[in-house]
């Protein structure tokens, strides 16, 4: 524990928490600080100018990161008939209907993403108490309830991330791994910020993108100068 504390203290000493860093420098600092013995995630926290207590200001959606997330995901699809074949062809790991629901009820949750065709929601809806707390419940707002399950599977496999404001109005997302180069992480960050801009609620007033900070799993947060992010896009 002492080693971890010393390491964090050293990292904090290299970063000015109040400074806005150009996007490439911010990412380079975070990558340089990612010295754990595993390939750390590179995460972003975006403070939005919304009131998450109001339903019309909750920001929720998904975006396919152009450079992927660096993580392989197992995808389960609730569907039947031709859609089932299409889902398998698209790379789904598990495809089923009532049989898949039975497996979920038994506690067999060997998947990271759940997709459902609209006709399957009568079955999936009964699994809310199991899937919901794990963040696995399909939702049309993030593209996981859709008649085009094949496209949804491809998106999930390609590096789609889901986002939603927390109770403080902050979006948390992973934009890659420490092994990614700066350009890849910048492109992914730009794609996420662009998606958030497009998802801005009409009821949001004042400054919308208030603060953007990047960090690694075991590192410290580095604030990003938004002007440089736009300039690099």
Swiss-Prot record:
GO terms for cellular component: cytosolic large ribosomal subunit. One of its GO terms (biological process) is translation. Keywords: Repressor, Ribonucleoprotein, Ribosomal protein, RNA-binding, rRNA-binding, Translation regulation, tRNA-binding. GO terms for molecular function: rRNA binding; structural constituent of ribosome; tRNA binding. It comes from the Bacteria. InterPro entries: Ribosom_uL1_bac-type, Ribosomal_uL1, Ribosomal_uL1-like, Ribosomal_uL1/biogenesis, Ribosomal_uL1_3-a/b-sand, Ribosomal_uL1_CS. Belongs to the universal ribosomal protein uL1 family. Binds directly to 23S rRNA. The L1 stalk is quite mobile in the ribosome, and is involved in E site tRNA release. Part of the 50S ribosomal subunit. This is Large ribosomal subunit protein uL1. The lineage of its organism: Bacteria, Pseudomonadati, Pseudomonadota, Betaproteobacteria, Neisseriales.
């Amino acid at each position: 524990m002492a080693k971890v504390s010393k390491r964090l203290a050293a990292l904090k000493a290299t970063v000015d928490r109040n400074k806005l860093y150009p996007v490439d420098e911010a990412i380079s600092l975070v990558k340089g600080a990612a010295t754990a013995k595993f390939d750390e995630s590179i995460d972003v926290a975006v403070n939005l100018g919304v009131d998450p207590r109001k339903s019309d200001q909750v920001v929720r959606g998904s975006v396919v990161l152009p450079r992927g997330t660096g993580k392989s995901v197992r995808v389960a699809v609730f569907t039947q008939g031709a859609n089932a074949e299409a889902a398998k062809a698209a790379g789904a790991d598990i495809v089923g209907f009532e049989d898949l629901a039975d497996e979920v009820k038994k506690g067999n949750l060997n998947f990271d993403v759940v997709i459902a065709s609209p006709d399957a929601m009568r079955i999936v809806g009964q699994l809310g108490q199991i899937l919901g707390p794990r963040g696995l419940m399909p939702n049309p707002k993030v593209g996981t309830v859709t008649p085009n399950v094949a496209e949804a599977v491809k998106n999930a496999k390609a590096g789609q991330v889901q986002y939603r404001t927390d109770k403080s109005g902050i979006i948390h997302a992973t934009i890659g791994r420490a092994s990614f180069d700066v350009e890849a992480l910048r492109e992914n960050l730009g794609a996420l910020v662009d998606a958030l801009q497009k998802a801005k609620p009409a009821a949001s007033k004042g400054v919308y993108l208030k603060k953007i900070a990047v960090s690694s799993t075991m590192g410290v947060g580095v604030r990003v100068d938004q002007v440089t992010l736009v300039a690099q896009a």
